[in-house]
A protein has these predicted regions:
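Bacterial Sec-dependent N-terminal signal peptides
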Residues: 1-29, 522
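N-terminal amphipathic/hydrophobic interface segments
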Residues: 21-522
Length: 522
């Protein structure tokens, strides 16, 4: 409400300046023509009845009507029938009835009121017009039409000299391509720009814009919104503190506290800056990005410095997602990190690059590259290549390990079920009695292996081709035999909860393997 008061004061400031600049000298109102002139005391003292083709003049302004009651001394008259006030070559006012005070150059107009100025048309049933300030005012429902644009409001003000209109209450703006609803609007007609103050909605054929403050360039179909700006379409919406939108190019730029909701794919993306090129099917969001994927089982939280999206331009559905720099994600049953991640939504395949790691339960999966295949919103297959390395923390103190050039990990109910290790396959796993006491360590090498896992423990290994397998009893274990070359247990990097995805995790002394955690066996 305070903002609206400021707008009103600003709008009328120039009116006051104009008023003070006017000469205070009174000018006469002259009778230019009337078919009949009759003095009739019954109509009042000094009242002259003018009948038929009445024409009055004050300065350069002419007043036409069918009849009038005119008081020459007070410069006041009432006009009746076919009122026409012609002020200059471009401004005309029409109505059925009018009251005019020549002393203050102020007119009241009644019924079928029309103000016409160049290509602008104002219509209402009651209007006042101040000739000194060029201000037209209607207090109860009016319409301004300009070319193919139409503006309707309960209250309105129009300065015809500078072609600026001010609208209040139930404002509706209609153009061939859009419809706007707002509470307060200033329309600079020459600039073809509208400034709105208060809750505003702009409807397009496909999109809807909302905001509480901003402007709309109707000529170029460009809008800028602030304070809860929202762009929505079938299946998605973008909300931010401020937003720029170009309808012709279908380009949007969102700034500060950006919130994107995709109801089709059940995804919410948050950040502080984003851009969208809808016709090209491209968009991105950056600065403290958090993405949430909602599934039946749980929600996955993902962070990256920047997130890119590719959309189907026909269906408006997301096809691919690319996350870059400092990628970290968390779900109750799986966590991960890498420096870049791409997700093809159509074939449900995620690709992790640049030092990728996945954690599930007590397992760590690592490789130069990781591909994740998803079925029914659950992890189905994970491909580690090259240099795949899987580590499982033993129930007590050791680590079971699987290593190879290319590894395919199969999941069941989001738990590791078995692993096919192809190329220089190696394993280390701990053997224990039922009471947990250690028997020894099994170390094996083969061209390929198929490893069965139950309850996060290796239970069976099937070897292919040449195999070297050695069981080291507890009493004969050599130092370092329990760790494969390249072993790194990087639990410190693992996201621990949804908020931990923002942590800039780094390897600690323990994680880098400079202590007993580093694999030494060759």
């Amino acid at each position: 409400m305070r903002c609206v008061k400021y707008i009103i004061l600003a709008f009328f400031a120039c009116i006051c300046w104009t008023l003070n600049a006017q000469q205070n000298s009174k000018t006469f109102v002259y009778i230019e023509h009337a078919d009949h002139q009759v003095y009739d005391a019954s109509f009042g003292k000094d009242i002259e009845r003018l009948i038929g083709n009445v024409a009055l003049r004050q300065d350069s302004t002419f007043f036409y009507s069918d009849s009038a009651h005119f008081n020459e001394k007070t410069r006041y008259f009432d006009g009746f029938g076919h009122i026409h006030i012609k002020m200059n070559d471009s401004t005309d006012i029409f109505s059925d009835k009018c009251k005019y005070s020549g002393d203050i150059k102020f007119a009241e107009l009644f019924d079928n009121v029309v103000l016409q100025d160049d290509s602008t048309l104002l219509t209402t049933n009651y209007m006042t017009y101040d000739r000194k300030t060029h201000l037209a005012t209607y207090p109860n429902n009016g319409t301004i039409t300009r070319n193919d644009k139409k503006l309707v409001s309960r209250k309105g003000y129009y300065r015809d000299d500078i072609q600026v209109a001010y609208f209040r209450k139930d404002v509706v703006v209609t153009t061939p391509k859009s419809r706007m609803l707002t509470d307060t609007l200033v329309y600079k007609i020459k600039e073809e720009r509208m400034y709105f103050y208060g809750p505003t909605t702009i409807f397009y054929e496909e999109n809807v814009l909302e905001g509480n403050y901003g402007w709309y360039d109707v000529k170029n179909d460009v809008a800028y919104l602030k304070k809860g700006a929202t762009l929505s379409n079938k299946g998605y919406s973008i909300t931010s503190d401020s937003m720029f939108y170009n309808k012709k190019t279908d380009y949007a730029r969102a700034m500060s506290n950006v919130f994107v909701e995709d109801t089709i794919n059940k995804v919410i993306i948050e950040g502080n800056y984003g851009e969208m090129w809808k016709k090209l099917g491209k968009s991105y969001i950056t600065d403290s990005v958090r993405t949430r994927y909602f599934a039946d089982r749980d929600t996955l939280y993902l962070h990256s410095d920047t997130l890119f999206l590719r959309m189907d331009t026909l269906t408006n559905k997301a096809e691919r997602m690319f996350a870059y720099k400092n990628v970290r994600f968390y779900r109750n049953d799986i966590q991960g990190k890498c420096d870049s991640l791409s997700y093809h939504i159509v074939d449900s395949c995620a690709k992790m690059r640049h030092d990728p790691i996945i954690w599930t339960e007590n397992s760590q999966l690592r490789g130069d590259s990781i591909n994740i295949m998803i079925a029914n919103k659950e992890i189905d297959v994970v491909l580690l290549y090259p240099n795949g390395f899987i580590i499982q923390k033993d129930t007590i103190e050791g680590f079971n390990q699987i290593k190879g050039k290319q590894m395919t990990a199969y999941f069941k109910n989001n738990e590791l079920d078995h692993v096919y290790d192809d190329g220089n396959a190696e394993t280390v796993y701990w053997l224990r009695e039922e009471d947990g006491s250690m028997i020894g360590i099994n170390v094996s090498q083969s061209v390929a292996m198929d490893i069965k896992i139950e309850k996060n423990q290796i239970v069976r290994i099937k070897y292919f081709k040449k195999t070297n397998e050695t069981l080291y009893p507890k009493e004969k274990m050599k130092p370092g035999i329990e760790l494969l070359k390249g072993f790194e247990w990087l639990d410190e990097l693992r996201p621990t909860d949804p908020n931990d995805i923002f942590r800039k995790a780094k390897k600690t002394e323990q994680d880098t393997g400079k202590t007993r955690r580093r694999g030494r066996r060759k």
